[in-house]
């Protein structure tokens, strides 16, 4: 498996309290995951409608996290990917997510790594034009700028 235990530990330090708070019935348990990805205060800064949706769907997110963790693809599996791949990360993303992007880029043959400066984990909502342009470039087969 492609591993980076230092950065992987960052995810574990978030998911433990997240799962515990959710199990205790804490309505704001999702703060752990949202602020992990977006930085402290991200959940509080979201519009009430978005925040309400996040709270209402926390159980689904916890199930997603608990069923997909740990996901450890082998180096051989990643190196066998034989399709054009663009790995996108935000310049302000959590260090663990930036590292995952680097590992994917290094392991998938011919993959492009694109960093969107000023963005974090929530790129589709914070940088929709940049994401749309990258998708268009990828579909058209032109290199990302």
Report residues per predicted region.
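Conserved serine/cysteine hydrolase catalytic core
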Residues: 50-106, 112-115
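Conserved strand-to-helix beginnings and helix N-cap segments that scaffold or border functional pockets
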Residues: 8, 97-101, 125-129
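Flexible "cap/lid" loop of the alpha/beta hydrolase fold
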Residues: 1-22
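Conserved alpha/beta-hydrolase catalytic His-Asp/Glu region
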Residues: 24-65, 72
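Short helix-adjacent coil turns
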Residues: 17-30, 126
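Catalytic active-site module of serine/aspartate enzymes centered on a nucleophile-bearing elbow/loop
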Residues: 109-145
């Amino acid at each position: 498996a492609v591993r980076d235990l230092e950065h992987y530990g960052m995810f574990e330090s978030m998911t433990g309290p997240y799962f515990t708070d959710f199990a205790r019935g804490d309505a704001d348990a999702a703060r752990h995951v949202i602020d992990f990805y977006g930085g402290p205060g991200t959940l509080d800064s979201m519009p009430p409608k978005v925040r309400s949706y996040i709270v209402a769907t926390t159980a689904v997110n916890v199930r997603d996290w608990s069923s997909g963790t740990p996901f450890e693809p082998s180096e051989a599996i990643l190196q066998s990917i034989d399709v054009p791949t663009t790995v996108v990360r935000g310049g302000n993303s959590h260090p663990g997510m930036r590292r995952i992007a680097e590992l994917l880029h290094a392991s998938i043959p011919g993959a492009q790594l694109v960093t969107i400066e000023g963005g974090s984990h929530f790129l589709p909502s914070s940088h929709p034009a940049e994401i749309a342009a990258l998708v268009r470039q990828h579909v058209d087969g032109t290199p990302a700028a």
